[in-house]
Amino acid sequence: MAVAYADKPNHFINFPLTQFEGFVLNYKGLQFQLLDEGVDCKIQTAPHISLAMLDIQPEDYRSVDVAIQEVIDDMHWGEGFQIKFDNPHILGRCIVLDVKGVEELHDDLVNYIRDKGCVADQSRKWIGHCTIAQLTNAALSIKENVDFINSMQFNYKITINPSSPARLEIVKLGAEKKDGFYETIVSHWMGIRFEYNPPTDKLAMIMGYCCLEVVRKELEEGDLPENDDDAWFKLSYHYENNSWFFRHVYRKSFYFRKSCQNLDCNCLGFYESSVEED
């Protein structure tokens, strides 16, 4: 089956950088150098990394939203990872930094989004970069400008871990910018989204064990199909009706999301175990 590419994209997956103060301070230093040198360019006011281009419609937003959450849930953090920015240079009409350390994240996002039936990534090879400014045609033709840009130095690293302010967002091309950020359709913190405190006691067993039999006991008779696979499918996509399952359980329980994703129970029968008295 042929792969569909977002060669005429209308959205992208955004990794905003404005919240990383140390990076932004150095980033703006580069922009100041350009302006001080008199290079005619339009400064980027919302520093970011475009992790994947998308060709999607509003009805696809929910699928891409869920794919982003699944990528975050499946991340193996360890001690975290580093994003490295260096080598200011001209790419097309833009002055950009090379970005290294997010290649695996790019691949995961593309694969998970495609698994949802949505179009992601372009036919040309993805190159991680961060735009500093866009040159005018006149500025691009001036050799002194090109030589100055090629002589610029930059080297900065950001460490991303579960406590970092890192986010993944769906942004429409041409979206407005405010205070260093794009207007977003969806924005998710990349930290580990474990939450063990259920909103009510009634949901505690469902969120803690993700056992289909427990779920059936908590729901009204006939709410779930008798076939287990059909039941998991209904739970996974129950948010279509904006039910309390999605609002209070699916969004809050890592285990429940993974159980729904795998169509399998995580409880191993422990919910029925009893404590023996001495």
From Swiss-Prot:
Coiled coil: none annotated. Belongs to the coronaviruses ns2a protein family. This is Non-structural protein 2a. Transmembrane segments: none annotated. Gene3D superfamilies: Cyclic phosphodiesterase.
